[in-house]
Amino acid sequence: MAVSSSNPTQTRTYVLDTSVLLADPASMSRFAEHEVVIPIVVINELEAKRHHPELGYFAREALRFLDDLRVRHGRLDQPVPIGEGTIRVELNHSDPAVLPAGLRSGDNDSRILTVAQNLAAEGRDVVLVSKDLPMRLKAASLGLNAEEYRAGMVIESGWTGMAELQVTDDDLRMLFEHGTIELAEARDLPCHTGLRLLSTRGSALGRVTPDKSVRLVRGDREVFGLRGRSAEQRIALDLLMDPEIGIVSIGGRAGTGKSALALCAGLEAVLERRQHRKIIVFRPLYAVGGQELGYLPGTENDKMGPWAQAVYDTLGAVTSPEVIEEVLDRGMLEVLPLTHIRGRSLHDAFVIVDEAQSLERGVLLTVLSRIGSNSRVVLTHDVAQRDNLRVGRHDGVVAVVEKLKGHPLFAHITLTRSERSPIAALVTEMLQDITI
C-alpha cells in the first residue's frame, strides 16, 4: 500500500492530486482495499501536461491507465474495482462553500481541496495525497489529513560513499608498493566506496574495486589543472576519471566543488584524452525558478542565459577564457535545459546533470535511459536546495543513489567541505541542519 493507515480495519478515501499521477502513473492501484478518488480537474491537468517536455510521458501513461479502466468497466464516474479497493473519477462534490474565503481562488488546487473537504463533510475518512508540499499545507490548514505519496520511496541510509578503516603498517606499505591490497573489512562495503586508511605511521586513500580488493588513490592526481583539496574531492576525481564507471553521483552542500570537479573531468576526457566528442550539461528548469522557456523574454539564446551562466561561471573559475572560447567554437560544450532531452540518444558524450536534486524520479530515470554508447553521466546535487517542491527528501536522486549503490557501473561520493570561500563555508556550516 502506498500510504499507511492508522486504522487498517477502516476503509479510507484517498483523494489523489495531479502530482501523484505524474510521479507514478500506476499509483492508483497501490492503495490496497481503500477507495481512490480522482477529481475531474486532475484529468484536465493531465490533459494539459500531455505534451510537456519533461512530464508529458507520465501524463500520457496516467491517462492510458485510466482509459484501460474505462474500456474494462464502461464508465468511471461510479466506483470500479481496482485491486482490493475501488477507484472513481469524481464529477460532483464541487461546491466551494465548504472552503474558507481565502481558499476560494478558483484554481485547480482549490477545486481538489473542495472535493476532499466535501467528501470529509459526509463523514468519510478522507486523506489528501500529494507530492506537492504547498498542497499538503493547504489541506492541513483545513483540518484534512494530508500525506505525501510514499510508494517507491527509499529509506535513506546516510551513505556518503566514504568509510574509514584502521589498517596495519604492513598493509599500508603493501598498498603503496603494489597499488592494491586485500582487506577483509572492505569486502562488506559497496563497490567504489572511498576509503581513508589509517595506521600508526601514516594514512592513505583507497577505493573498493568491483572484485572487493582495495586500490590506492593518489592524492596528487591532477585533472585539467585541478587537484582535490580534500579526501572526498580526491576520491571524486578518481571516480570521475575511471571510464569503467558509467554513472557518478556527487552530492554536497553549496561551494563544495561538485560542478567544478565534474566540468574539469569532462574537459580532461574531451580535450586531453579524446575519450568523448563533447560535454553536454543539462540543468532543470527549476534551477532558476521553474519558468517555462517560452514565457521568458527575448530570443532562444536570451532565454537560455540564466541556465547557461552558472556553468560558464564555474568554467571561468577553473580554466582560462581562451580554453572556454576554444571549447565553444569547436562545439564541444552544450548547456541545455532538460526539456531538450526527450527523444534524444546521447552518444559519445560526457553528460553532466546539474542540480539533479530538483528532478522527480521519473524524469531522472528518463535522463539516465538516454545515455548511449561511449557516454558517461555525472549527477551533481544538493538535497538541501530542492527548488521543485514535488520532490521529497527521500525520492528523486536520493532514491537513485540508494538503489544503484554497490553496482560496478555506479559510484557516489558526498563532499563535505566548502571550497568556494570563507563566506560560503560559514553559510554552509551555519545552515547545515536546516531541512526542507
Curated annotation (Swiss-Prot):
Keyword line: ATP-binding, GTP-binding, Hydrolase, Isomerase, Magnesium, Metal-binding, Nuclease, Nucleotide-binding
Pfam families documented for this protein: PhoH, PIN_4
Enumerate the catalysed reactions: n ATP + n H2O + wound RNA = n ADP + n phosphate + unwound RNA; ATP + H2O = ADP + phosphate + H(+); GTP + H2O = GDP + phosphate + H(+)
Q: What EC number(s) does this enzyme carry?
A: 3.1.-.-, 5.6.2.5
GO cellular component terms listed in the entry, alphabetical order: cytosol
GO terms (molecular function) for this protein are: ATP binding; GTP binding; isomerase activity; metal ion binding; nuclease activity
The UniProt-reported impact of residue 283 to A is: No longer unwinds or cleaves 5'-tailed RNA, decreased ATPase activity
| Segments forming domain PINc | 12-137
**Where on the tree of life does the source sit, at the highest rank?**
Bacteria
Its function?
A: Unwinds and/or cleaves 5'-tailed RNA in vitro, the reaction is maximal with hydrolyzable ATP; double-stranded (ds)RNA and dsDNA are not unwound. Unlike the protein in mycobacteria there does not seem to be an antitoxin gene upstream, suggesting this is not a toxin-antitoxin system. Has ATPase and GTPase activities.
How does the entry describe the domains? Has an N-terminal PINc domain and a C-terminal PhoH domain, suggesting it has RNase and nucleotide hydrolysis activities.
Which family would the database say this protein is a member of? Answer: In the N-terminal section; belongs to the PINc/VapC protein family.
Q: What is this protein called?
A: Protein PhoH2
Which classification does the entry list for the species? Bacteria, Bacillati, Actinomycetota, Actinomycetes, Streptosporangiales
